[in-house]
């Protein structure tokens, strides 16, 4: 599948809150979150993915939704290298969407949601404008929700990040007593599903209190 129903409410949030904003959608896959931002009136959306074939789907999706497509906004690249380039050029965004795979390894770096999600967040924080948003998504099925929350709470302790909202997976993705055959391997609470979606606000050091 290339379209994830469990992020339906996040797409709704993006459409309602990111109008006029610049957005970086990392690990974009087929770009549904970025297209939702465009549908909500975001002024600029850059979609990053390691694989061109997925970004081609993202471009087609944007066109089907009546949006102008600039190929330069769909960037086939390694996450680690591209974020370094953005930092060096001082390129900033009003919102960064961080939706990494559970595990991935390239020559430039390793993604392991169970062990280094904090590293991923700290990687993108410097390219987010003051007053902007960081949207984090973790699909680590075997990670408890309170363990994930502990990681975020630790990052928020200095006052530069703040948890604004946890976004639920819609009820129609949760199943019911007649369809659930096996319980989740780890308790996702305070989230309602193993897909753990969080909206954080960002303060720059010059303005944080």
Indicate where each model-derived feature is located.
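SAM-dependent Rossmann-like transferase core, predominantly class I methyltransferases
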Residues: 1-21
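A generic alpha-to-beta junction signature in SAM-dependent methyltransferases
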Residues: 18, 66, 127-129
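Conserved class I S-adenosyl-L-methionine
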Residues: 19-29
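Conserved SAM-binding loop of SAM-dependent methyltransferases across substrates and taxa
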Residues: 30-43
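Conserved SAM-binding motif I beta-strand of class I
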Residues: 44-49
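S-adenosyl-L-methionine
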Residues: 53-97
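S-adenosylmethionine
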Residues: 79-82, 86-157
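C-terminal catalytic and target-recognition region of SAM-dependent MTase-like enzymes
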Residues: 133-209
């Amino acid at each position: 599948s290339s379209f994830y129903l469990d992020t339906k409410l996040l797409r709704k949030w993006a459409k309602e809150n990111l109008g006029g904003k610049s957005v970086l959608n990392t690990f974009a896959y087929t770009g549904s979150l970025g297209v939702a931002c465009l549908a909500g009136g975001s002024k600029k959306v850059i979609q990053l993915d390691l694989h061109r074939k997925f970004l081609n789907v993202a471009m087609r999706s944007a066109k089907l939704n009546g949006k102008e497509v600039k190929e330069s906004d769909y960037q086939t690249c390694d996450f680690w290298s591209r974020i370094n380039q953005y930092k060096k050029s001082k390129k900033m965004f009003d919102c960064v969407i961080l939706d990494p795979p559970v595990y991935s390894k390239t020559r430039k770096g390793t993604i392991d949601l169970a062990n280094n999600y904090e590293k991923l967040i700290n990687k993108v924080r410097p390219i987010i404008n003051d007053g902007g948003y960081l949207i984090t998504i973790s699909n680590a099925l075997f990670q408890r929700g309170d363990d994930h929350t502990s990681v975020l709470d630790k990052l928020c302790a200095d006052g530069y990040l703040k948890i604004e909202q946890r976004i639920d997976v819609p009820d129609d993705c949760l199943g019911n007593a007649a369809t659930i055959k096996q319980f989740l391997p780890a308790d996702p609470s305070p989230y309602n599903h193993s897909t753990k979606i969080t909206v954080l606000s960002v303060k720059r050091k010059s303005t944080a209190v």
